[in-house]
Amino acid sequence: MRQKAVSLFLCYLLLFTCSGVEAGKKKCSESSDSGSGFWKALTFMAVGGGLAVAGLPALGFTGAGIAANSVAASLMSWSAILNGGGVPAGGLVATLQSLGAGGSSVVIGNIGALMGYATHKYLDSEEDEE
């Protein structure tokens, strides 16, 4: 039930940010590629969601634990060294392991899609400044 609530909340945030209006900026209606912004954003969201779902297991954060000789194992080692011998609860490594072990693909995909959309908006705002 909690995963469904988190997933719905992330979908709400994603839709809220997609429909936001930027105050103080004028958009040119004479743009030659009008309408392509949606498809460009959708592409970033699909790539971000796909990478997030496939990325955690590829880094070594699996359902069976942290895979040996992986990036996740190195992160865990560095985290333990920096924190005096133990990995802190609620830290980056613990959070990623929790998502890799028990997080549903839907939640991870939503987070990745949100990150993809944020990347799109950042790159789009840089193009507007030029």
UniProtKB/Swiss-Prot annotation:
Gene Ontology biological-process entries: apoptotic process; cellular response to virus; defense response to virus; immune response; innate immune response; intrinsic apoptotic signaling pathway; negative regulation of apoptotic process; negative regulation of extrinsic apoptotic signaling pathway in absence of ligand
Residue spans crossing the bilayer: 4-24, 41-61, 75-95, 99-119
Protein's UniProt keywords contain Endoplasmic reticulum: yes
Membrane topology: Multi-pass membrane protein
GO CC terms, sorted: endoplasmic reticulum membrane; mitochondrial inner membrane; mitochondrial membrane; mitochondrial outer membrane; mitochondrion; plasma membrane
Modifications after synthesis and translation: Glycosylated.
InterPro entries to which the protein is assigned, alphabetical: IFI6/IFI27-like, IFI6/IFI27-like_sf
Main location: endoplasmic reticulum
Cellular compartment(s): Endoplasmic reticulum membrane; Mitochondrion inner membrane
GO molecular-function term, one example from the UniProt record: molecular adaptor activity
Keyword Membrane among UniProt keywords: yes
Signal peptide: none
Disulfide bonds: none
Induction cue: Up-regulated by type-I interferon. Up-regulated upon Dengue virus type 2/DENV2 infection (at protein level).
Entries under Pfam families matching the protein: Ifi-6-16
UniProt feature coiled coil, ranges: none
Swiss-Prot/TrEMBL keywords: Antiviral defense, Apoptosis, Endoplasmic reticulum, Immunity, Innate immunity, Membrane, Mitochondrion, Mitochondrion inner membrane, Transmembrane, Transmembrane helix
Family listed: Belongs to the IFI6/IFI27 family.
Protein purpose: Interferon-stimulated protein that plays an important role in innate immune response against a wide variety of viruses. Inhibits flavivirus replication by preventing the formation of virus-induced endoplasmic reticulum membrane invaginations, which are double-membrane vesicles that flaviviruses use for their replication. Has an antiviral activity towards hepatitis C virus/HCV by inhibiting the EGFR signaling pathway, whose activation is required for entry of the virus into cells.
Assembly mode: Interacts with CIB1; the interaction is direct. Interacts with the chaperone BIP/HSPA5. Interacts with RIGI.
Protein known as: Interferon alpha-inducible protein 6
Natural source organism: Homo sapiens
Gene giving rise to this polypeptide: IFI6
